[in-house]
Amino acid sequence: MAGSRRLAHFFMASCLFLCYTASVNGGKRGNSDKCSYKQGTQTSSMDEGARKLGVTFRYDNCSVNWSPLGKHAIHEVNNISFSHLSCDSQAAVVVHWMASPLGIEHVKGFRVYLEDKNPERKQCQHLILKDPRQLNFSYKTIRMSSQPFSSLAFETDYMVRIVPFPTFLNDSFFPPSFLRTNSCEVLLGPDNLVCKPFWKPKMLNVSQLGSNLHVVFDHAPSTFGFSIYYLYYKLRQEGPFRLKRCKPEQNGPKTTCVLQDVTPGTYAIELRDDSNNTRRQTQYHVSQVHSPWAGPIRAMAITVPLVIMSAFATLFTVMCRKKQQENIYSHLDEESSESSSQTTALSADRPWPRPKIFICYSSRDGAKHLAVIQSFAFFLQDFCGCEVSLDLWEHLEICKEGQMSWLSRRIDEAHFIITVCSKGLKHFVEKRHRKGKATSKEKNREPSASDSSSSSRDLFIVASAIISEKLKEVHQKSSDLSRFMSVYFDYSHETDVPTSLSLAPKFKLMDQLPQLFARLHSRQLSLTDREPQPPNVSKRNYFCSKSGRSLYVAIYNMHQHVTQEPDWLEKELMPPPLPNKRTIPEKVDSGLVLNEVKLKHGSESECPPVRSNVLILPQTPQVGVSLSLSREDLGEGSSSQDAGSCRPVLHTDGSASPPEMPRDSGIYDSSVPSSELSIPLMDGLSPDHADNSSLADSVSSSSGLGDEEPPAVSSLHCTAHTICKADLHHQHLHPSEGLIAAAST
């Protein structure tokens, strides 16, 4: 009984073994049928020896059973060769090699790598010795083979690396081998359709019929099995293609595909098959279809309504913009008149007290900066209710008292001292400070005639030095520096504040206008009552008044000037070009020779209200006049003006230059660009200037902004007339032909 059971178990095991062997052999036969050798593959007689010795491998996954560490050194393999196959209409390769006798007894298996230029398509085979489990020296001539590497491209280069294991050597120690797969014709045959995927039609004709395109092409051979053709078309400047599917006509060798309602233009047309392998492309220009109604009548019917509509639209736009501008400016004018009337009423009801303000500024930053200063002073006086002291408005007072006396008195009387800091002010103040010329002796002395233009233009440097000294004194005694203020406009920077004035509070205008206004009206004055504050003082509404609007335009013009000319200060510092000197030739037959003319500056007591001096010469054809000016007698002051001197302008034709007439300018005309706007008449000066500063008022009120240059106010720096003496060295001059000096008062 027990024997029969053992016999049954033996038969069952035998059946299972036979079934497993049959299935394995069937799988191997299937792989053999799937990947077949072609002509040109490499063979070797060593395969028979390998089968006799019974060398078989167990194939495993590379990523699972990989232990790279070993204790012995195994040398690289020898005699690497390749066999080319075809698997599923693709190229395949089998790798062959021989083990090296050095370290062959330690080999447990091999790893075979195959990769192309793309590292992501790397293939690997892990071969473990199955029978025998260990090699010896007699296996050195046995050729070993890998499984086929399939899914390879035709005529492509690959790299193969064979690494025996286990070993302590890295994979890079074993040198690679290179191979190139065979072509499709060699592996599959020249008649195989896989080797000819790029069939192109011999004919691709395009014609236009109305607004349709007719595309005609021939069919591919029936062996390709194309069931449908794809026609892609698009305008050349468009992005993606549009698709038209065309079924081949069974009755003929050609097929016509119609593209309906195409717009005029140049089209790119491409024919493809259903596998997207067959392509042929062409271009065709679709012309405009002319209808019977096309022509001049159609053009006029389209153009005339468009022109009429455009004209109405333009007229409507212009009228709307004009109306909008009128509303804006009328609103501004109403607010301006209300503000002016309110300020006038406040001044009439409570004319005193008004904070006295002294403004120190740089007179060397150009005419546009001077326009900003005058507008700012007028704004403080008109809108902010302050009494402003500005040298441009008090030329007569300066002539009477002298520059230093007037400067000291105005600084002492002022409740607030405002320094308008700019790029030029910092440059000249710190330049004078570095040179050490701003000494107390130079500050306290009266300017002489030889200082003329430089001392007059550098008055702000002396004023800055005095303000700096007073600021230091107040800072040492107490911390209340509210009397001193350093302001700068948006075309300047905080770094433009000189170091000597850094202790004073700083304000950026017009961003910090409310803080400045509060500072001007918050100081507790020694007077009984104070003037009410104008409401709603801010950066957004200060230009509602005339003075604020003038200040806004002046700041805008200066800001535009700084933006367009970043090196504007360097241009202002450049010396003016020398005028061309023209000498009057001396006539030999003249009876009168005027050798020299000396200009004598009178004292303050000898200063009648003289406006100009005129030198009149008789115009006789027989008498010639030679005029020579002594540069040593005139000195540097003869070419400029001073607080106590004036100079007549004598032209080469012998006539005196008339005084430059002040120019008046408009206020915010809606038809004038913003860059050409000007300051309005500054008629809101304080009452103390009405009786003795009428001339200064006219000068300040006629100062233009924008692109206009202000009038030369330096011509008013005069309180003393000039006495001209002529030495006559000829005795035959008739009394009626003498020199006539006329002084106009």
Curated annotation (Swiss-Prot):
Keywords: Glycoprotein, Membrane, Receptor, Signal, Transmembrane, Transmembrane helix. Residues 439-448 have a biased composition (Basic and acidic residues). Its main location: membrane. It is a single-pass type I membrane protein. Pfam families: IL17R_D_N, SEFIR. The keyword Glycoprotein applies. InterPro entries: IL-17_rcpt-like, IL17R_D_N, SEFIR_dom. Residues 693-705 have a biased composition (Low complexity). The chain crosses the membrane at residues 299-319. Residues 1-26 form the signal peptide. The keyword Membrane applies. One of its GO terms (biological process) is dorsal/ventral pattern formation. GO terms for molecular function: interleukin-17 receptor activity. Residues 354-518 form the SEFIR domain. Glycans are attached at residues 61, 79, 136, 170, 205, 276. Residues 432-454, 631-713 are annotated as: Disordered. Residues 27-298 are extracellular. One of its GO terms (cellular component) is membrane. Residues 320-745 are cytoplasmic. Interacts with fgfr1 and fgfr2. Feedback inhibitor of fibroblast growth factor mediated Ras-MAPK signaling and ERK activation. May inhibit FGF-induced FGFR1 tyrosine phosphorylation. This is Interleukin-17 receptor D. It comes from Danio rerio.
